[in-house]
A protein has these predicted regions:
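Catalytic phosphate-donor-binding core of small-molecule kinases
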Residues: 1-47, 56-163
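Oxyanion-binding "anion nests"
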Residues: 53
Length: 163
């Protein structure tokens, strides 16, 4: 959900939300609260908030963990953070995550499962609240295929290559 001085807006995603800078110059600063407690101020190109389903997409490509689909968690993965000590973190899916761009001299984008919304620099302060939806998505699971088999075949996970 996006909150500013106007009406709150709701966005839904199965894989991930990404708050990232728009354009090529500068970093953005994102303050993150977890259940109302200050978690971190990320000084980075952006931040990925992903589900286990989304963990093998953008989050994995920037160093986030692979998370099995049945895990009841949410993953926060910074995009090119300015500090070497900032790492991805895995939180319970019941955690309400609030994020706000606190240094808004750069335009930024909220992307969610291939869609996006742009925000200009110096606009109204906007707080994004991420929480688990009350509804469930049922996915087809083929009995002859297991998640680990898919990881090995599609991502070449754990495959040794000798030259």
């Amino acid at each position: 959900m996006r909150e500013g001085t106007g009406e709150p807006s709701n966005y839904w995603a199965l894989n991930e939300f990404v708050i990232e800078r728009s354009g090529s110059a500068g970093l953005i600063s994102i303050r993150v609260m977890a259940d109302g407690i200050h978690l971190n101020d990320y000084w980075a190109d952006g931040l990925i908030i992903s589900t286990p389903t989304g963990s093998t997409a953008y989050s994995m490509s920037v160093g986030g963990p692979i998370v099995a689909p049945g895990a009841d968690v949410v993953i926060l993965t910074p995009l090119a953070p300015h500090s070497l000590t900032v790492r991805p973190i895995v939180l319970p899916s019941s955690t309400v995550i609030e994020a706000q761009v606190i240094r808004d001299d750069q335009p930024y984008v909220l992307a969610y499962d291939g869609r996006s919304r742009s925000f200009e620099r110096g606009g109204e302060p906007i707080r994004f609240r991420f929480s688990r939806a009350s509804h469930v998505v049922n996915l087809v699971k083929l009995p002859e295929q297991h998640y680990f088999q898919t990881l090995r075949s599609k991502l070449m996970w754990g495959v040794l290559r000798h030259g």
